[in-house]
Structures are given as structure tokens and as C-alpha cells.
Amino acid sequence: MSAKDSMAKEYFADNARFADLCNNILYGGREVILPENLKERDTTEVLTALGLNKKTIAMQKLRDIFKNASIKYTGKSYVVLIGVENQSDIHYAIPVKNMFYDVMAYGNQVKETAKKHRREKDTATSDEFLSGFTKEDKLIPVITITVYLGTKEWDGPRRLSDMFGDVDEELLPFIPDYRINLLAPREITDFTGFRTSIRQLFEVLQNAYDKEKMQEVLQNDENFSKVDRETVEAINLFAGTDIDIDEKEEVIDMCKAWEEQKNEGRELGREEGREEGREEGRISQAKVTALKLQKKGHSIEDIAECVEFDEETVKKWLVS
């Protein structure tokens, strides 16, 4: 597992950030899904099926994050399963990948329900017995959210049909489609709905390609004056920044850190310029001295030792 994969899983597994992410994608920023109403689920999806030789085939996929969400909204209570798939790079087959996760999650629900009925022997008809599922049984809806953590614009498919070639239009109504739920930083137009520091992460990712815009965001958004350590670490990793983090600090003033970094860069540039100037002066003086010594009849070896440069360099000076 790469450093980016590990960081993304740990970062968004936090219930407060997970809820914030889901509320912005699913409810337009309204605080409907609460952190305390989220429960971890096993991220391993395992589904078995019979192969052509009647042997059981087991398929296994590992999700990034998968949680059970209990939602109370509009006077009603709901339960939904929400998975988050993090992408640091564009995935050009993401609809198939996510659809497979969802199908396996539904398949597991049917499998567990069938086990329960076999154990309790409570199916009423042969159809229900063969299905392992009764007319009264219900599935828990599954939602998968794709979080793109790159700085480029997303140019990958957004639905299964985007991956098709030419298709007879008369057939389209009979072909099930699948749409991904994508969060891409470059496409966010309003950050005010975010309540956690994922806002700062997405704002930086949106502007990472333009240093002037990045500077403007950091100077004008006071939210960057207090950013938690984990978010700054995520920003450094995904946006490619190099914000200094004091080991003793849990909250970082990114505005100040960014300005200090710029100043250090300017000072380093000036120092390098001074060093370069000093070196050029030393070489120029050495050339003058070498020519004088040559006129006096000194050997190349003696001249090189005197000006403290190698003999090959001195030879080039004297023949040019």
C-alpha cells in the first residue's frame, strides 16, 4: 500500500471528516449525518458463486472505508451503508470498480439473509426457500463516494455508459447504467458547507497548480490560521507542498508557515546569488594571476598550485 493510500484511509476514516464529506456530497452541506451515528463495517467484501464445474468460487475485494450510517431526517429514520474510495490518480475504469463493490455488498446482504432463514427455517414458500429471500426482506442501500485527491482536472468516466463505444440507441433503455458519486477538488464551487479541515485540504488541492491563487487563498481565508496537524500532513503529501511542521505543534498557522517558507526561499536565492558572485570573482582573479605567472615563466604545475585550481582548468585559461 502506498503512502498516499495509507494517509487517505486514515484521514477520512475519522468519523467527523467522514460525516462532513458525506453531508457535502449527499445533502448539499446540511448537517444530517452525524459522527456519533457512524459505525465501522468490515471493509473486506467477500462473495461466493458456483463456477462452471460446480465448485465454489470466492471473490474478495477490499474497500478503503465502509461505514454504517444511521440517519434521522425529515422525521424519519434510515440506515444506509456508505463506502469511500480514495483516488490519488485518475482511474479510467472507476464505474466498473465501484459497481463491483456495490454489487458485492448487496450480494453479501442476500447471503446473510439466506443464512438466517436456513437457520430459523422460516421461509413460507418454495420460491422464498430457493431465493433465500422473502417478499418482506429488504436490502440496506449502498452508496459509494469517490474522493479524487489529485490536483489535475478529472477527465475520467463518470458513469458506466461513458466507457461504452458506439451503441444502438434503441438498446440503451435496456442497458443498466451506473453513475459514480465523485468529489473532485477542482470542481468544488462553494467551500462554506464544509465544517472540518477537509475544507482546507480541498481548497489547497484546487489551487495547487497556481501559486498566485494559492497565496491569495492562504492570505484571505482565516481558516488557514488554525489547521490540524493531520490535515497539513495530508496537504503536504497530496498537493506536494513542503509546509514545515513543528513536532510539538498539533495546530499549525498555515498562513504564517507559507509566508516563512517563501521568505526562506528568497533568502536562499539571495545567498546562492552571493555565493555564485563570490565564486565568479575568485575564478576571475585566479585567471589574472595565472596569466601573470605564465608571463614570468612559471610552469603549469606551479601556477595551478598557486591559484588552487587543477592543471586542466589552468591550461584552458591560458590557451583561451
Locate the predicted segments by residue.
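Elongated, amphipathic alpha-helical interaction scaffolds
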Residues: 1-320
